[in-house]
Structures are given as C-alpha cells and as structure tokens.
C-alpha cells in the first residue's frame, strides 16, 4: 500500500503500526479500536510504501507546512491528533486560557455541540464556573449548518439541529463557547433562542480568529459572505 500526503500538508496522513501490519489514515481516531499505535505523521509531499513489517520512504517531505488550522477548531474528531496535537486538548486549552483571562461575570459556561463543547469545558475550569449543557444537538437528520448552498436551508439547519433546555438556562447569565463564526447563521439564531427561553444574559466566546478567506473545494462562503 502506498500512502502520500499533499505537497503543502493541508490535510493529514498518519501511519499506524501493530504486530504484522501498518495502516494509513487521515484521522488517528480510527486506530485505537483496531489496536494500532501512531507510528509517524507524513510530512508535506511525503510518500511511503507500507509492507507488513516495515515502511519504505519513496519521497522525502517538503520543508513548508500549510496545514488547515480548522482541523483542530472544527472538523476534527475529539480523539484525533494532527502533527502530535490532540484535537480535544487544543480546544480545551483555548477555553482554559480564555477563562483565566476573562473578566465577565457569568453563572455558567455552555458549549455549542459538538466542537464548542471542549472549549466550554476548558473555559469553565479556567473561569471557575460550572459547565451546563443548555443546548443539545439532534444529529440523525441535520448536516453542518454552513454547508448547504442557500441561506434559507442554512437557517433551517441551524435552528432545527440544536435544541435548548429551558431548565438549564432560565434566569442564568450564560457564556456560550463556539468554534468559529463563518456566516453568523448559527450565532444569530442561537442568541435569539436563548433569550426566548429565559436567559438573563448571553455572552459568546469564539475559539477561532476571524475567517477572512474561503476554501474552494467545499461549500464554504466566498470572500464576500464571511461575517468578518
């Protein structure tokens, strides 16, 4: 089997090893239940051939790396590691640091599921406030809210897939953590819903810096549409 990574290293390729076998994946979260251990991360442009008992390097890695930071912010599964950095640890640490610095007076921290939860757990620990699950996600039928091609469907998805819990938010000064703001679809609707369900105050903290450019290969916004 030959495994190759793109020349800029924008997406990961991870090699795993167990007795008598090697495997390649883009998500190291696939390894634990198959008894593989991470052997190495391919560098940008690196190519290897895998045999049952060893790896042969066919092309050395390039020096430049332009990995997509959104892997840690949004796309990545919590147990995956990219370039040796675990997704959940990065999200938790960003929230922890923000909570330690934040001077806002809030009653609890909450996360927009799924990728905002790790940040919110870190924020709660850093701030010294409880974590409340005030919004749950209904996953069977709704995709990610930024991927539909038209605004009407994006708004519908953002509204329908997240279900507020009045018992956990009524009368509270809530601080919500989310991974990023792309078009602002989810943020706008969530804030309104939280007030409608009785929140006293709604504060938001975002893990990702402003998005200023788009990806050309998926249904993300053009330069004109990001909220930033």
What positions do the PLM features span?
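N-terminal segments that mediate ammonia production and transfer
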Residues: 1-116, 124-166
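Active-site lining segments that contact anionic ligands and/or coordinate catalytic metals
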Residues: 10, 19, 44-45, 169-173, ...
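Short, contiguous acidic/charged loop-to-helix segments that flank catalytic cores in large enzymes
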Residues: 85-86, 163-165, 176-183, 223
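ATP-dependent adenylate-handling active sites, centered on carboxylate activation for C-N bond formation
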Residues: 102, 148, 167-173, 189-198
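Extended, hydrophobic alpha-helical segments in both membrane/secreted and soluble proteins
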Residues: 109, 116-123, 127, 131, ...
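A short, conserved beta-to-alpha structural element at the edge of catalytic cores
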Residues: 192-219
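Single conserved hydrophobic/aromatic residue that forms the stacking wall/gate
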Residues: 216-228
């Amino acid at each position: 089997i030959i495994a190759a990574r793109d020349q800029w290293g924008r997406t990961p390729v991870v090699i795993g090893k167990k007795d008598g076998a090697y495997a390649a994946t883009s998500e190291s979260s696939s390894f634990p239940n198959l008894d593989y251990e991470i052997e190495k991360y391919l560098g940008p442009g690196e190519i290897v051939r895998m045999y049952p008992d060893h790896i042969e390097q066919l092309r050395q890695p390039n020096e430049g790396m332009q990995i997509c930071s959104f892997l840690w912010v949004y796309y990545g599964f919590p147990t995956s590691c990219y370039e040796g950095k675990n997704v959940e640890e990065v999200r938790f640490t960003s929230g922890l640091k923000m909570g330690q610095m934040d001077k806002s007076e809030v009653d609890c921290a909450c996360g927009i599921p799924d990728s905002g939860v790790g940040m919110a757990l870190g924020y709660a620990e850093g701030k010294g406030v409880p974590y409340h699950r005030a919004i749950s996600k209904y996953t069977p039928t709704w995709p990610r809210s930024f991927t539909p091609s038209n605004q009407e469907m994006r708004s519908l998805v953002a509204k329908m897939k997240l279900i507020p819990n009045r018992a956990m938010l009524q009368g509270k000064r809530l601080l919500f953590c989310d991974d990023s703001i792309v078009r602002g679809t989810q943020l706008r609707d969530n804030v309104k819903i939280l007030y409608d369900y009785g929140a006293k105050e709604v504060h938001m903290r975002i893990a990702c810096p402003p998005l200023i450019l788009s990806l050309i290969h998926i249904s993300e916004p053009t330069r004109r549409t990001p909220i930033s």
